């Protein structure tokens, strides 16, 4: 039996990505990707999902270097769950998308050309 945990998204960055360091000196970036739905809602309008993605190390570094707000990217990754126990012993469950690969479908240069043409 093949077991699969894979997420694929294509969308636009909501803001410029920023690079941070984790406690154990790994590079990390948290991005949000705007992904329009392929169908209209009851009012005849397209909705957009804003999906949070976590990037590590070289994936994070390269995304920060080559992308900015509005860049179109492809994300290939996986879902990862975690549990955080609060002081009152209440457990909070989180599901995150961890990027394994980012494909740059537009670049900062492409975006700058679009702005200059406007």
Residues of each region from the PLM?
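Structural motif
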Residues: 6-8, 28-30, 48-50, 72-74, ...
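Conserved short histidine dyad/triad with adjacent acidic residue
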Residues: 13-16, 55
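Disulfide-stabilized netrin-like
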Residues: 46-59
């Amino acid at each position: 039996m093949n077991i699969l945990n894979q997420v694929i998204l294509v969308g636009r960055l909501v803001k410029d990505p920023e690079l941070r360091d984790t406690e154990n000196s790994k590079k990390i970036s948290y991005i949000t990707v705007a992904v329009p739905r392929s169908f209209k809602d009851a009012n005849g309008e397209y909705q957009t999902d804003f999906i949070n993605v976590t990037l590590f190390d070289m994936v994070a570094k390269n995304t920060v270097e080559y992308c900015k707000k509005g860049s179109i990217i492809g994300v290939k990754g996986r879902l990862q769950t975690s549990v955080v126990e609060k002081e009152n012993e209440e457990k909070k469950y989180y599901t995150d998308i961890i990027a394994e690969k980012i494909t740059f479908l537009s670049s900062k240069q492409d975006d700058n050309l679009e702005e200059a043409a406007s």
